[in-house]
Every structure is written in structure tokens, then in C-alpha cells.
């Protein structure tokens, strides 16, 4: 009998999860189509998607693919030579890059997996949303219906769409959604049965994965692990076991960080700029982001401070309506069922406290509503500590998800008092989803059209140019002589990666690599002295420097000079 119940319980989870995944895939195809799924087509990356970050992520992967295997596994000695760097600092999703590096012997020179990974993120987000929404309803039919609708709703969260492709690693929001599900389900099992569920061991797994996908997701997963430990201690009085659970998640994150290089790689983290990329107080209702998209068919874009585009947390009109309805229902419940509300707060105050703290961190000490605001002075040591996560607006992702879950649970809970609760909850949730889809329909069309145009328009830049094609033959490195233009930096790194070359270009976003800067200066000095390495391809974005090279090496017939996309090259024809 017990085995039958367990099988039935698994079935009730699996079916909504599969339907949620299908909903997530459908949303991806609606928004982007199939264009980004072509692994050999990287023109859209070479054009840049909303900004240049995706070029950095792609360059990090390509150069890492050419790197020697070493420890940590995410170390790329082909970037920022001579010391190299870890690809956690190029935001190239270390675990995914490591997996594909194992296949490098059979992969073509141009190979981008960002489309398929993002499709997976939508599927997993739909799965997590389905599990979160379906856990509060009985019966496999109702779970399936709510799972499908809930999965689609979570796949239609604007924060997922905004990060997808612009900053692919940050589309992995399924990490903290699954962590939230594990926490809530484990707490429920412990409360109902008194047994500590095995499901909780997924929290260390998620912590391990998070640190090797993007470090910003680690605090959000660890918050869920901490909430579970607190509630385990509160419910069972087993504070030793609770501490062990949290320590296990922390240890898993540490091991993962050491393996991929996010922790202990010897590169100092940037600690400046806390508050620069914070969340504006109007973020939940502000459909304003990079790319100038029309995120809402009803609401207008509101002003932001410079840098607060990264604190984008617009919820979508459907979720906003859901929250307003849930708030009204909660106020009514406060007066009609005060004891039930008191019990709810007793059960959930740790979650509310965690969300409040994350919100404060996301807003930062630069507190603004639009253009009106003030700055709270903080000691420098605290600013430096918070600066490790300087893009603080991302920390609101978990509170936003908690708000959406609370709205769904409140709506479904209210429907239980009606004559046909299953039909009522399904219809209302479908209406919420319909409003959300309607509100986001314009931005969906804009993003779909962007990829359609990218497919139709040919691209020619330094990373995809007839003059630079094949320069890796017989050469080992692409060396910049001095600093290069920022708008060519990542494209040159992509070129090096495609051609199988290492480079002294530094494309990492955190920390300092003084050795690579010195190498670029030494390279310039070497050429000025009349010497060069025949195995190197030299590049500058300063035409006057390139003309000097031609004068210095005027009698050397082994060298050739050419220009591609405002980048000036010198290389040995027969190295």
C-alpha cells in the first residue's frame, strides 16, 4: 500500500511537471522562434543582443574550449595571457562550458549552445512553476490543470525574458524556484508527518549547480536552504540536524566553487559600485529595460537612475492584477478569520523576513522612486562587502517569485470555499495568464522579429570577415599591442576563440589581471623595438600604431598587413 501511495504521489508530481515544461517550451518558441536553436549560426551574437554582454559570454566559451585542462576546471589559460582567468568571470556558465569542452574534438569552430540552454531554462522554469502552483491543490486532474497554467505563468515572467540571451546565465532562474519548491514541500512533509524528508538533499545539489552557473544565484538558493533549516529547527526542535542541513548546502557550494573556479581561483573580486545597478522602487510596475522594448501594452515606462536598468523587475500586468486581488482577499481574511491569518504569519514570518532583507539589499543605499530619492551613507567596509554583489537589483528575483507564489496560493485557497473550487481556481488562473500574455504580446513580437531580422541580415565584422578567416593557421596567439577599442574587444576575443588562438585580451567582468595588461604593453614595446614572434598575430585599433609597424618592418617580406572592421593586423605569412 505504501509503495502504491508513493507511486501515485510521484505521478501527481511528474504530470504537472511535464505539462509545465511543455508550457515553458511553448512560451520560448512564441517569443524567439527556432532561430537561436541553430548551433552553427552565431551572427546574432556577433551583432550583439541589446548590448555586448552576449559577445563576452560567447568569447569566454570559445577561448575556454581551446584551453588546456587544469584545476580549477573552469580555468582558461587562453584568456588574458599569461595568467589566464576562470570563466566564472566571463559569465560563460562554467558547468555548461565544461560539459561542451569534453566534446570539443567533434564540435565545429562556430558553435553556440546559448539557444538550446535558454530553451532548457524556459522548460525548467515552467517545470518549477508548475510544481510550485500544483502543490496546493488535490487530485491529479486539478494538479495537471494548475500545473500547466502555473508553468506557463512563470515562463511568462518578464525577468526571465529580459535576461534570456542578453545575459544568458541569469536566465537560470529555475535554480531558486526549485530551491523554493524543495523548501516548501520539505516543510510541509515535516509538519504533516513529523519525518525529515529526503527531498531536502536537493538543496545542496542546487547550491553546487548555482555556483557554477552564476554566482548571483547562490545567495538566493542559500536563502532557501537557510529557511528550511530554520523551519526544521522550529518544527522538530532538531537544531543540530537543521545546522547540518545548512552546512551541507554551504559545503556543496564551496566544493562547486572550488571546482569551477568561482571560489579560490586567486583572482580578486571587484568590490566597487554597490548601488550603481540597484533596483528602483518603481521596478515592479516599470516596464523599462535595455533594448527599448514595449514590455506592457498598458503601463508606460517610468524614469530610472543610470545603471538601474539592471534592476529590471517588472512583474507583468497579469501578476500585478493577481497580487492586487490577493491583497484584497488577505485584508478581508484578516477581519473575517484573524486566527487563520495569525497562523499564516507564524508559519511564514521567516520567509517574509528573508524577502524584506533581500529587497533592502536590492534597493541598496541609493533609494529612489524614479528620479526622486536619497543616498544613505554607509561605512566603506560595508560598501566593499556589499560590492561583491554590486548588481544588487537581481536579489529581488526571489522576493518577486515569492509574491507570485503567494498570489497563486491565496487565489486557490479562496476558491476552496466555493461550490466548485477546481473549476473556479482554474478559470481565475487562466484569466491571470491571459492578462499576462496580452500585456507581454508586443514585446514577444518585438523579440521574435529581432531574430527574424538577424537571420535575414548578413553580418561582417572582425569576427566574421574574409580577411580574418583562417588567420589561426600556423599561429598560436592573437596579441593586442596596447589597449584596443571597447567595441572591438569582445569581437577580437571571439575571433581568437574561433581560430584556436590564445589572447592577451581581458574580457572578464570582475577582478584585475595586471599580468595581461603588462603583456599588452610589453607586446607594443616589443614591436616598437623591431622584434616580433612569428607564431603570433598582432592587432591594434590605432591606425597610427599600425602605420608605424609598417615603417619599422618595411624590409621584412615575411610579414603581411591588413585591415578588417577598423582592426589593424600584422602577421607572419610562413610562421
Question: Which ranges hold each PLM region?
Answer:
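Membrane-interface micro-motifs in multi-pass membrane enzymes
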Residues: 88-93, 114-123, 153-181, 212-216, ...
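Start-transfer (signal-anchor) and selected internal transmembrane alpha helices
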Residues: 1-42, 244-249, 331-354
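Perimembrane helix-loop-helix junctions
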Residues: 219-251, 326-337
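Periplasmic/ER-lumenal interhelical loops and adjacent helix-loop junctions
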Residues: 51, 256-330
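Membrane-embedded helix bundles of polyisoprenyl
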Residues: 119, 123-136, 143-189, 196-229, ...
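Membrane-interface helix-loop junctions at the exits of transmembrane helices
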Residues: 31-35, 148-166, 257-266, 283-296, ...
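Membrane-interface coil-to-helix junctions
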Residues: 27-124, 157, 167, 171, ...
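Signature aromatic-anchored transmembrane alpha helix within multi-pass, membrane-resident enzymes
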Residues: 141, 145, 226, 250-251, ...
